[in-house]
Amino acid sequence: MRLVVARCEVRYSGRLSAVLPEALRLLMFKSDGSVMVHSDTGGYKPENWMTAPTVIEESDDEIVVRKLGGEDRLDIRLAEIVS
């Protein structure tokens, strides 16, 4: 499991579309390929997530998570990695 605390913007596209504006978030990448995006407010439920199986692509300022066998996609644009 990998935990990242970052100031980031998250865009989901697929069955629906959603944009989470830039804010401080906890990104959780689990060993099964699932990904969860949490904020400091709003309780225990993630603001966005992607269930396994996924493909995760990383660059210096962006993480792209794609659902295998589907069109669902999370684009996480990193402004600052805190930890």
Enumerate the predicted regions with their spans:
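Short Lys/Arg-enriched alpha/beta "domain-start" segment
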Residues: 1-34
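Acidic, aromatic-enriched beta-alpha/helix-loop junctions
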Residues: 23-64
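Surface-exposed beta-loop interaction hotspot
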Residues: 68-83
